[in-house]
Structures are given as structure tokens and as C-alpha cells.
């Protein structure tokens, strides 16, 4: 039994929290901005737990969708489903159960949040299949990973103002930046098996495209800060995020696999910088 649970834990990437963190940071930015400071504890706990559950569900359904591709990729061929250690139906069941628990968490929230949660679930569930035909599936991932933003505003304000959509667009650019670096790790394998990624689509302009996406992210988050009249700590946080992006350039410019993966993981700190600036800006108001 314990061995089975360990396989399920690997399926949902409990040992690899970076995906959860990249999903969590934009949600926390939005919660603080929507509430004008720390949100209600109940709302915070719902979104915190929901982030973990939905990322876990997304990993399970992603492995189900990619089970025939992952066996040809060095980094993924030993995943439990790909290696035949768990069945496809188990992955689907786990994803469904986790998604249902996540939806149950938001039942105390308003109807707008619930409807947005349905849209978010559809986007998250369909993302793995976009790699078959969409040239830049990372943009769709950005919508999936950023949908906590409009949901947070809906939960706190019972509306989704323009600033939420600006932040969602910013998150799309951020996701394209960090996930292109991630896709550069697997590019050779992905070319062989026919999966589409932004790293393949951008080709020799991959590094330039990543840096342009970081720039677009910073500009849009700056616009959000202006719209919300955020104080100097927010801009310090955004400047620190820009420094992180510059550091990522030094990691990816030579396209070394391990350094590209390090750049992807380091985006956790970029997200943390934006959150720290946001939290302090509201704390000293």
C-alpha cells in the first residue's frame, strides 16, 4: 500500500513543488491586490489548498495524455504511468478526485467564482492535448496557471475588473518565458516525437523570445501597479523580478540543458519578488 501511495505521489509531483509555486504566486498577487492587503483567512486557505490540488490533478491528466510520448523522452520515461507502474485509469481517477475536492473547497464562495472555476478546470484539463497542434502551447499553459487571478478577484470583489485581465495576460507572457526555458531541455526529444513547443517554434530566436516575454510581463505588471496606485515597495519587487529575468538570460544564452532547467526553477524567486513587493506595499499604506 505504501509503495502504491508513493507512486501516486510521484504521479502528482509532490516531490517537485516548483509547478505548484508557479501556480501559487500569481494567485497570491491577485488575492492581495483584490483585497487591498491580506485577504480573509478562509479565502486564503481555500485558494492555497486549491492551487495544490489543481496542480496535482493537472500533473495526473498530463501524464495520461502524454503516456505514449513520455516513453521517448529521457527526462520523463521513468514516470510511473509511462513506466507501466500504474494504470491509465488510475491517473484519470486521481485527477478527477483531486479536481472534485478542489471544487468542493470553493462551494462557500460566490457563484461567479464557481463559474470561473469550471472554466479553469476545462483549460487545465485540455492543456496537455494542445501540444499536438498548437505551436505555442505554453501560452495556453499561462492561461491555465493564471486563472487563479480572475478567480481571486471574483472571490474577494464579486467582479473581475480590467486589472485582473491585465495580470492574466502578464502571466501568459511569464509562462511562455519560463516554460520555453523548460522546453529547451527536451527540444531534441520533442522534435523526434512530433510534439509542438515554443522552444521548437521560436527556433534560433528562443532566447530572444524568452527575454521579450519577460519584458512584456514586467510592463504589464507595471501597468497593473499603476492602475492600483501601488507604492514604492511594489516597484522594488518588480525591479528585483527584472534582475531575476536578467540572471535567467545568463543561464539560457548557451542553451545548456541543465542551465535552462535551472532558469525554469529560478522563476520561483521571480514570483516571490513580485509578491513580496505587493505585500509590503499594502502593509505600509
UniProtKB/Swiss-Prot annotation:
HAMAP family: UbiA
Entry's Gene Ontology molecular function annotations: 4-hydroxybenzoate polyprenyltransferase activity
Main localization of the protein described in the UniProt heading: membrane
Catalysed reaction equations from the record: all-trans-octaprenyl diphosphate + 4-hydroxybenzoate = 4-hydroxy-3-(all-trans-octaprenyl)benzoate + diphosphate
NCBIfam families listed in its UniProt record: ubiA_proteo (TIGR01474)
Cofactors: Mg(2+)
Descriptive protein name: 4-hydroxybenzoate octaprenyltransferase
Transmembrane feature ranges: 28-48, 86-106, 110-130, 133-153, 160-180, 207-227, 232-252, 262-284
Catalytic EC class: transferase
Keyword terms: Cell inner membrane, Cell membrane, Magnesium, Membrane, Transferase, Transmembrane, Transmembrane helix, Ubiquinone biosynthesis
Pathway connected to this protein: Cofactor biosynthesis; ubiquinone biosynthesis
Family per similarity comment: Belongs to the UbiA prenyltransferase family.
Statement: the UniProt record of this protein carries the keyword Iron: no
Record-linked CDD domains: PT_UbiA_COQ2
Superkingdom, natural source: Bacteria
InterPro entries hit by this protein: HB_polyprenyltransferase-like (IPR006370), Prenyltransferase (IPR039653), UbiA_prenyltransferase (IPR000537), UbiA_prenylTrfase_CS (IPR030470), UbiA_sf (IPR044878)
Keyword Transmembrane: yes
One of the protein's GO biological processes: ubiquinone biosynthetic process
Enzyme Commission code(s) on record: 2.5.1.39
Membrane topology: Multi-pass membrane protein
Role summary: Catalyzes the prenylation of para-hydroxybenzoate (PHB) with an all-trans polyprenyl group. Mediates the second step in the final reaction sequence of ubiquinone-8 (UQ-8) biosynthesis, which is the condensation of the polyisoprenoid side chain with PHB, generating the first membrane-bound Q intermediate 3-octaprenyl-4-hydroxybenzoate.
Organism in which the protein naturally occurs: Cupriavidus pinatubonensis (strain JMP 134 / LMG 1197)
Subcellular location: Cell inner membrane
A GO CC annotation given for this chain: plasma membrane
Pfam families (alphabetical): UbiA (PF01040)
